[in-house]
């Protein structure tokens, strides 16, 4: 049995999406048990519509719901101990749950997670890891917005953690890892990127295969299983990719409506277009993982539908089932033992 805590108030639609999404996840994984946190007047009526889910769940009342517009510091002050978001995270800390899922405010969720769960030993800064559809399947990209900037050691930590996530999700024994750079040549890029590359070349790890530098166009190609970058660049890349996907979808729709011949052609090609739409649908690869914490926290898109929230739950389910934290901690311990003298710098939080 896998226990998952849910911030039922998170996201643009709150319980109206969160609860149906959890119900879908339960249909696919009957061994999940949920703990929902939220405002009783909003959560209980929706939960009552799903008898099977209600029977496999526990509801715990909260006093506060964190707004999508709240600043992290405000959310922490107002919501500590009594908000649905904090209580869902705290359930992981106390052992009541093995993973927490929220579609709420990203900055608030990160601040509360760091404050409540703390960081893994020897990890200074968390990263948000996103699942990216590619020509070869799926890749993991991190950091996509937890912090701005990263030094060499932090980038290597991201590489180790991202590889652990790839093993858990993709069941790849030794994921390939690349550092995002302005070119593939070793002489190109910022000093911290070149230093991180040197460290990864000099410190062989059983859990990953370092493939060198990759460029922006390699992300969509699926050149490597894990793409490592710092949060500012990663967040821009993520938003650019999402925007491009929407743009391409709209351009295709316009083209198919332009002439009678195009409309007839669409009828015959509808199956192919449907498969393309499904491949590019953010709801199919929803769920950003907060890596570096001493517990599993998954961030769902705030605008996700029920299928999207279900995807985020399934990411958490796979993380627990494949013992993600234990694997990452073991890999990090090996790296820091092998390379204990890498310097690091501070940084400031990025808003995703």
Swiss-Prot record:
Which reaction is recorded as catalysed by this protein?
a fatty acyl-[ACP] + phosphate = an acyl phosphate + holo-[ACP]
Task: Reply yes or no: does the keyword Metal-binding apply.
Answer: no
Question: What subunit structure does UniProt give?
Answer: Homodimer. Probably interacts with PlsY.
- Pathway(s): Lipid metabolism; phospholipid metabolism
This chain is encoded by the gene named plsX
Recorded hits in PANTHER family, A to Z, give: FATTY ACID/PHOSPHOLIPID SYNTHESIS PROTEIN PLSX, PHOSPHATE ACYLTRANSFERASE
Which species does this protein come from? Answer: Brucella anthropi (strain ATCC 49188 / DSM 6882 / CCUG 24695 / JCM 21032 / LMG 3331 / NBRC 15819 / NCTC 12168 / Alc 37) (Ochrobactrum anthropi)
Q: Which family does this protein fall into?
A: Belongs to the PlsX family.
Name the record gives this protein: Phosphate acyltransferase
């Amino acid at each position: 049995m896998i226990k998952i805590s849910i911030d039922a108030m998170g996201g643009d639609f709150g319980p109206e999406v969160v609860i149906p999404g959890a119900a879908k996840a339960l249909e696919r994984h009957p061994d999940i048990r949920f703990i929902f946190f939220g405002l009783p007047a909003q959560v209980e009526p929706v939960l009552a519509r799903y008898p099977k889910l209600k029977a496999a769940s526990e509801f715990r009342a909260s006093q506060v719901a964190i707004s999508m517009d709240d600043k992290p510091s405000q959310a922490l002050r107002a919501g500590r101990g009594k908000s649905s978001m904090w209580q869902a995270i705290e359930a992981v800390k106390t052992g009541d749950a093995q993973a927490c899922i929220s579609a709420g405010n990203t900055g608030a969720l990160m601040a509360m997670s760091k404050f409540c769960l703390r960081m893994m030993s020897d990890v200074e800064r968390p990263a948000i890891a996103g699942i990216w559809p590619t020509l070869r399947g799926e890749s993991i990209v991190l950091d996509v917005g937890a912090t701005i900037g990263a030094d060499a050691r932090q980038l290597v930590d991201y590489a180790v953690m991202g590889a652990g996530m790839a093993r858990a999700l993709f069941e790849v024994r030794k994921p390939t890892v690349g550092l995002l750079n302005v070119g593939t040549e070793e002489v190109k890029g910022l000093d911290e990127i070149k230093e991180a590359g040197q460290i990864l070349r000099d410190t062989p790890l059983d859990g990953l295969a370092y493939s060198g530098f990759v460029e922006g166009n390699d992300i969509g190609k699926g050149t490597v299983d894990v793409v490592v970058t710092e949060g500012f660049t990663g967040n821009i890349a993520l938003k650019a990719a999402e925007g491009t996907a929407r743009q391409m979808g709209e351009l295709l729709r316009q083209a198919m409506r332009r002439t009678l011949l195009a409309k007839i052609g669409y009828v015959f090609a509808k199956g192919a277009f449907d498969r393309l739409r499904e491949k590019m649908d953010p709801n199919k690869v929803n769920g950003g993982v907060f890596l570096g914490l001493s517990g599993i926290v998954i961030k769902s898109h705030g605008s996700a539908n029920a299928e999207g929230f279900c995807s985020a739950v399934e990411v958490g389910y796979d993380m627990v089932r494949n013992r993600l934290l234990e694997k990452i901690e073991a890999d990090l311990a090996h790296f820091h033992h092998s390379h204990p003298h890498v310097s690091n710098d501070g940084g400031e939080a990025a808003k995703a």
